[in-house]
Swiss-Prot record:
One of its GO terms (biological process) is NADP biosynthetic process. The active site is at D355. InterPro entries: ATP-NAD_kinase_N, ATP-NAD_kinase_PpnK-typ_C, Bifunctional_PpnK_predicted, Inositol_monophosphatase-like, NAD/diacylglycerol_kinase_sf, NADK. This is Bifunctional NADP phosphatase/NAD kinase. The keyword Kinase applies. Mg(2+) 2 binds at D85, D88, D229. Its cofactor is Mg(2+). Residues 1-283 are annotated as: NADP phosphatase. GO terms for molecular function: ATP binding; metal ion binding; NAD binding; NAD+ kinase activity; NADP phosphatase activity. It comes from Methanococcus maripaludis (strain DSM 14266 / JCM 13030 / NBRC 101832 / S2 / LL).
Amino acid sequence: MDMLEMALNIAKDIEKSVKPLIGWEKSNEVVKIGADGTPTKRIDLIAENVAINSIEKVCSAILISEEIGFKRIGKNKPEYVIVLDPVDGTYNSLKDIPFYSAAVAIGRIDKFADNLEELINNLKMKDLEVGVVRNIATGDTYYAEKGKGAHFLRKGEKKSISISNSSNLKDSSIGLFAHDISIDTLKFIKDRRFRRIRLFGSIALEMCYVAKGALDAFINVNETTRLCDIAAGYVIIKEAGGIVTDKNGQEVNLDLDVNSKVSVICSNEMLHKKLVGIFGNRWRIKPTNFGIISRIDNEESIEVADNVIKYLDSKGIKYELDSSTYNALKNRLTKKCDIISNIEEISHMISIGGDGTVLRASKMIEGNEIPMVCINMGTVGFLTEFNKDEIFSAIDSIICGSYKVEKRTKLMGFAKLSDGKQHILNDSLNEVVITTKNPAKMMHFEVYIDGSLVEDVRADGIIVSTPNGSTAYSLSSGGPIIEPTVEGFVIVPICPFKLSSRPLVVNANSEIKIKLLKKSTYVVIDGNTEFEAKKGDEIILRKSESNAYFVKGDNFYNKLKKLSLM
């Protein structure tokens, strides 16, 4: 019996066994915890046992199923590996909602190992050659065989199917997995960036709807989609001309392990790029062109920058230098090198130095969505994610697309001057500091949050810091350490007159107003003096419309530990 016929028969046998159970009160009983860690209902166990009996009649195989985990079926050498979800959409079946399915995927075992784990470890989802999904309630069947296209079967009538050609999200119908829904998904729904959303409750069938063009895409951006949920649908969508990746655009190719989980975006090529851009690491699908900025007053940093250039040359990867780095390196360069002229053409910015170099890079990026690869040449370097020994592995991870990007909040604002004019402030990655022009001279402020007066402050100055900057000047002034991805800001008086004037953490959506009641001050943004403010001026700060993006490296809490040891 060939693999397709076997898969079709397994699905039919499951349908015959499950249909009579609909409405039976014992179908809903939890009989055990399945191999995947979720409760197994009686209906699931019966369906799985029927599938095992169906397989035993025709072949020896390795079965991978949510309920049983791994099982070797038959006494002979296994010929096939079968990935099974006996009832996908168990809740729907128990409530007689006609949207639940049996999903079967089969691959051939060419090499046999006596050790079952060794055998399975050598197999991936790409090795599956046949996928069958049968709607148990209606009998509608979707199937595909590698290299032979995808098909839909209803009441004996067979049709070829293919994905939609929709290219505009606003015109698209999206299938969505809503369990443990993410903030990004909620925002996607709230912003109505699509025509319609559908939540059906059977991932296998929803993937088949994408394969036949009834849905334009299916997404689950949480890392919760299991092998057995998607194995059959994966084969069918691929044969229908679709793309199946994780949320970052990396092709899904799970180990054949019942506990394997992944995020999923299924669609056509045109929509896929847009969905990855919304939910994942959009930079993985952008051509790589590094920008390089280095500390130029440190010979070791210049040497590392030179080695980075040589490494990129050896890989054939494009790069451009900022002008000061170019001038520091021009006598060492062995080939023509471009100076950054259009920041939008840069995909990733490599910063070599300390936190000051990162701040220079952030200012240069000017709000564009360009991830920074930050190499620490100093001590702790809270803004730097990699040490100098990790630079080449960091570059390699970006080239091959296996990296994560962390989004961080910035500050934006303006000064409302006493003469009625406005002065727009540059965005701040770390902090805005309002400080006295003359050392040891006390200043007088009023601090407002969302229009309400919070405190009257006498101090040497005041810091408004992002979480990113909470480990810098703010920390030295007695402010709290805030994890970089937290959505908030901290207001820290510098050497306050009153002991009751303490740091204040506020929501990132708050508007912060600082009114100067006495003396002229300097407004300093990320270490650079922005302008001189006078008595009566108001500094208005809020969350920036743009964010900073960092390629993830060292764990934030590891850096805290290093700080405690200094």
